[in-house]
Regions:
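Secondary-structure boundary elements
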Residues: 99-182, 263, 278, 285-293
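Helix-biased "structured C-terminal domain" signature
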Residues: 250, 266, 274-302
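Short beta-strand segments enriched in hydrophobic/aromatic residues
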Residues: 13, 81, 234, 287-289
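Structural beta-strand/beta-sheet cores of well-ordered domains, especially the beta-sheet scaffolds
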Residues: 1, 7, 20-22, 39, ...
Length: 302
């Protein structure tokens, strides 16, 4: 599939901002199944300084500073990407999950060393006995890792309700686990917490999810969504992606922007401002297919 993606973020401030320094993580990664033919970032007001670099995890970041007084900041990322159906070029090896746990600390290959760092607590994800207990209902003795991961993904999808009104970006997995409600970020954090609590390596993936209008209705510009899902390291195979919000294995409708230990590593836009007072935030995402699009039932949540 080929997509044109427009991600527009608008901050409106009650009072003028005299100086704002920001970091944008809005350019798609290049992967074996994902290529970007065009990617640009439009910023208003025009930044006084602007630099780009790759972070520790390989994500593409843009650092910029706006020094003129402003009551509105608009950051618009435009990308054109080509994505194949699967990031995994082979069938996952049916490795028992316990063997995967033992293999990662002893894997000194570049892939193994990279995976090892995703097995620990991170600023937004703590390891808890209750998470391990929940995970072990799926990770029964000697069960193949891919099968257990699929089962856990389905359980989270069934046991938790999508509800954008009960959480925010700072809600910890412990609270989500109690309330049994949340959004994609919450369910990704929760699944990662469960997996790390049983010593598996799992990372947080941010990106875009294509949505589909109801039958007979036109596609609405700006109605697509930023999204989050989970990637788990399977020794001998590589990274396997799972979307607990929609009970899906990500395919050509999921476009990866970035990955890290948790949301804090891959926030689309963050920074510091001087002034401004209160503010409002509006985000619109448009993911337009540029080639023939198949008909798909259902409306995924994000």
């Amino acid at each position: 599939m080929i997509y044109r993606i427009v991600h527009r973020t608008t901050y409106k401030y009650k009072f003028p901002v005299s100086v704002g320094t920001h970091v944008a993580c809005l350019k798609p990664r290049t992967l074996p199944n994902l290529q970007s033919s065009r990617s640009e970032l439009r910023i208003q007001p025009r930044p006084a300084t602007r630099t780009e670099r790759v972070d520790f995890f390989g994500n593409l970041l843009c650092f910029f500073t706006v020094r003129e007084p402003h009551k509105e900041l608009v950051v618009e990322a435009r990308s054109e990407v080509t994505i194949a159906a699967s990031a995994t070029p082979q069938q996952p090896i049916p490795l028992p999950w316990e063997e995967a746990v033992r293999a990662v600390p002893n894997d000194h290959s570049p892939a193994g060393l990279e995976a090892y760092q995703f097995g620990f607590e991170s600023p937004r994800i703590r390891l808890r006995p209750e998470f391990a207990e929940y995970a072990l209902e799926s990770f029964t003795p000697r069960r193949p890792l891919p099968e257990a991961l699929r089962h856990l993904t389905t359980r989270i999808y069934k046991d938790f309700r999508f509800d954008p009104k009960v959480t925010n970006v700072r809600t910890p997995p412990e609270e989500v686990f109690k309330k049994r409600r949340g959004v994609c970020q919450d369910f990704a954090h929760l699944q990662i917490a469960c997996l790390r609590s049983i010593n598996l390596a799992a990372r947080y993936v941010s990106g875009y999810l294509r949505t589909y209008p109801p039958p007979g209705q036109a596609r609405l510009v700006g109605a697509d969504a930023s999204h989050a899902w989970v990637s788990v390291y399977c020794p001998g195979t590589g990274w396997l992606d799972f979307d607990p919000t929609n009970n899906l294995i990500p395919s050509d409708g999921h476009v990866t922007l970035a990955w890290g230990r948790d949301y804090g590593d891959v926030s689309p836009l963050r920074g510091l401002i001087l002034g401004g007072g209160s503010h409002t935030l509006k985000v619109a995402v448009d993911m337009e297919p540029l080639d023939a699009e198949p008909s798909r039932p259902g409306q995924p949540a994000s």
